[in-house]
């Protein structure tokens, strides 16, 4: 049976920024909202692949953050973006979904954590390749990102080459850091997914988030995994979807691992199986 043609919807945030969003209808009361990483868009292949895979388990809403893709405004690198996520979550409620989870990648992970900790209204939260703190420059990739957003030439290149419009104003007030926000998410279930080959944020960021958070929480350190959307193979996407489905069931107080690790695997590590070419960052 052929799926219906997907059409985009324009949602408007409380500060009047138009947000380009799409909805892949599900067959249950569960919706997964995808929050993409910096310089990406719901139309980019890695994001679209994950959206379609999640759609086998749940309804899916994905969108472009401000300053990205077909949305308006300028990117504030995670500060005002919680308003973007808020309008999409509200839209999911309007569509009739009773269980709503947000899955964020990299920058999107920091936004999902801050939204869940400061605003609330989610039934489960997943952070994939997210930072534990701001201003991290400990890797070459993150030093490049800082040059791209802090310098005028960097912002120009980012706009023209990566189709991402970054605000030149910076943060007037430093937003609540991701780890501090993670501490406020309980009793909503939280899953932290991170690769041990992440070239942007090393695993210490995932551990920082996990240590700050309260139960119920889980940490999956994935051997061989790199960074964010491009590093998520089909097996991992399916495992996250199963965790979300179990975590949001009303009769289950504490979610269990969708695929528990074997006896030779540490309790906070989940082995990677059947890696695909998509696993390259």
Question: Where on the chain are the PLM-derived regions?
Answer:
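N-terminal cap/lid segment of alpha/beta-hydrolase-fold proteins
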Residues: 1-26
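The serine-hydrolase catalytic nucleophile loop
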Residues: 38-51
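Conserved alpha/beta-hydrolase
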Residues: 51-72
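Alpha/beta-hydrolase active-site loop
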Residues: 76-95
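Primarily recognizes the serine-hydrolase "nucleophile elbow" in alpha/beta-hydrolase
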Residues: 91-146
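Short beta-strand/loop motif that positions the catalytic acidic residue
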Residues: 185-186, 192-194
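Conserved alpha/beta-hydrolase "acid-adjacent" motif
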Residues: 199-205
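Catalytic histidine-centered segment of alpha/beta-hydrolase-like enzymes
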Residues: 225-235
């Amino acid at each position: 049976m052929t799926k219906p043609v997907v059409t985009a919807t324009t949602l408007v945030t409380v500060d009047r920024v138009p947000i380009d969003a799409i909805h892949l209808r599900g067959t249950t009361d569960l919706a997964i909202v995808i929050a993409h990483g910096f310089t990406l868009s719901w139309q980019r292949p890695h994001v679209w692949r994950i959206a379609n895979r999640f759609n086998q388990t749940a309804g899916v809403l994905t969108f472009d953050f401000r300053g990205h893709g077909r949305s308006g405004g300028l990117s504030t690198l995670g500060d005002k973006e919680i308003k973007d996520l808020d309008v999409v979550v509200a839209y999911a409620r309007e569509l009739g979904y009773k269980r709503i989870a947000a899955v964020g990648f990299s920058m999107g992970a920091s936004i999902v954590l801050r939204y869940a900790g400061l605003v609330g209204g989610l039934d489960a939260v997943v952070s994939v390749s997210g930072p534990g703190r701001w201003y991290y420059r400990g890797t070459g990739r993150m030093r490049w990102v800082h040059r791209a957003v802090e310098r005028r030439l960097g912002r120009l290149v980012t706009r023209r080459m990566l189709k991402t419009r970054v605000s030149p104003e910076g943060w007037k007030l430093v937003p609540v850091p991701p780890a501090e926000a993670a501490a406020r998410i309980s009793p909503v279930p939280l899953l932290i997914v991170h690769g041990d080959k992440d070239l942007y944020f090393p695993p210490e960021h995932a551990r920082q988030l996990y240590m700050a958070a309260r139960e119920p929480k889980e940490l999956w350190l994935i051997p061989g995994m790199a960074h964010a959307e491009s590093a998520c193979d089909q097996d991992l996407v399916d495992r996250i979807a199963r965790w979300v489905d179990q975590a949001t069931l009303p009769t289950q107080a504490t979610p269990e691992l969708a695929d528990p690790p074997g006896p030779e695997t540490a309790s906070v590590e989940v082995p990677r199986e059947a890696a695909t070419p998509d696993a390259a960052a």
